[in-house]
Design a protein with these regions (language model features):
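Conserved catalytic/acceptor-binding region of the Class I
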Residues: 144-212
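A short SAM/SAH-binding and catalytic strip from SAM-dependent methyltransferases
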Residues: 112-127
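N-terminal, positively charged/glycine-rich alpha-helical extensions of SAM-dependent methyltransferases
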Residues: 1-16, 20-21
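A short acidic, Gly/Pro-enriched loop at the edge of an enzyme's catalytic core
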Residues: 105-113
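A short glycine-rich, Lys/Arg-flanked "PGG" loop and its adjoining helix->strand segment in the class I
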Residues: 127-142
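Conserved Class I S-adenosyl-L-methionine
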Residues: 181-182, 192, 199-271
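Conserved alpha-helix/loop element of class I SAM-dependent methyltransferases that forms part
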Residues: 24-44, 58
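Class I SAM-dependent methyltransferase SAM/SAH-binding core
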Residues: 46-48, 52-104
Length: 271
């Protein structure tokens, strides 16, 4: 078994479940993007940073047996979770590769499409990975990207001072770790440098009340992230508990409105 390469939020079973919920929230947008990118029966698609494979499973069903999904993931635990799920669905058209997108070569070429979501935001040199993925495409092949454009649009009405502070602290911590939460701002001008031509962009943001399923996406992230910030020594445990209590209070108010971080959908083709 390959050495497990962990993530900030971990690769344990709870995180696998959280990522499943996250994919269910975003699945309508994802399926629509793939359709507009002409991912269809017979396509060969790379799922870059596949995690436990929720997108890979959907892609495998779309491309059917004449197509193929190449799932690239650095966590062996996530790859094992994907293998179990694929077997349960009877899918045999998914190939998994235990690689790191930063340090390893992309083990494919001439593919029809690449799908990547919330990976570039955690990389110190995103242009290098973008170039690798572009090189794996056939001429005219497409890359579909979902990345944050403005994480600071995460907000609540009524306003909460401690939750607003949480957003600011989370962004500062993200950048201090070498990532960039608003990475789409940088990615768009990088496309030509990677041999890609922009076809389409689409901003995605939600404004929801606590009874909307989209709310669950942030509800499974914010309390855990506040605790992780405390464990890292970035904030005090007391501050983290105040964030958790404030979020619980916002959630208990049926009239609260939460706006989500702004995601930019990018579809580009290889020149």
């Amino acid at each position: 078994m390959a050495q497990e390469r962990d993530y900030y939020l971990g690769t344990q079973d709870d995180e696998v479940r959280r990522l499943g919920l996250q994919h269910r929230v975003w699945r309508p947008h994802v399926l629509d993007a793939w359709r507009r990118a002409h991912i269809t029966v017979g396509s060969t698609v790379i799922d870059a940073g596949a995690g436990p494979g929720y997108a890979s499973l959907d892609l495998a069903e779309i491309v059917e047996e004449t197509g193929k999904v190449i799932a690239l993931e650095r966590s062996e635990r996530f790859i094992e979770a994907l293998a179990r799920a694929a077997a349960a669905r009877g899918l045999s058209n998914i190939e998994t590769r235990n690689i790191d997108l930063v340090t390893d070569a992309i083990p494919a070429s001439g593919v029809d499409a690449v799908w990547i979501r919330w990976v570039f935001a955690f990389l110190s040199e995103p242009i290098e990975v973008l170039k690798k993925l572009a090189a794996a495409l056939r001429p005219g092949g497409v890359i579909v990207i979902h990345e944050y454009m403005d994480w600071g649009t995460l907000n609540w009405a009524p306003r909460s001072a401690i939750l607003s502070e949480f957003v600011e602290v989370a962004i500062r911590s993200w950048r201090a770790s070498g990532g960039e939460p608003d990475i789409a701002v940088q990615l768009l001008p990088m496309l030509p440098k990677a041999g890609l031509r922009l076809k389409e962009t689409r901003p995605i943001i939600h404004a929801v009340k606590p009874d909307n399923y989209v709310w669950r996406w942030l509800a499974t992230f914010i309390p855990n992230h506040a605790l992780n910030l405390a464990r890292a020594g970035t904030v005090t445990p007391q501050w983290a508990e105040e964030v958790i209590e404030a979020f619980a209070a916002a959630q208990a108010n049926p009239d609260t409105i939460m706006t989500t971080p702004l995601v930019m959908e990018i579809i580009a083709e290889k020149v």
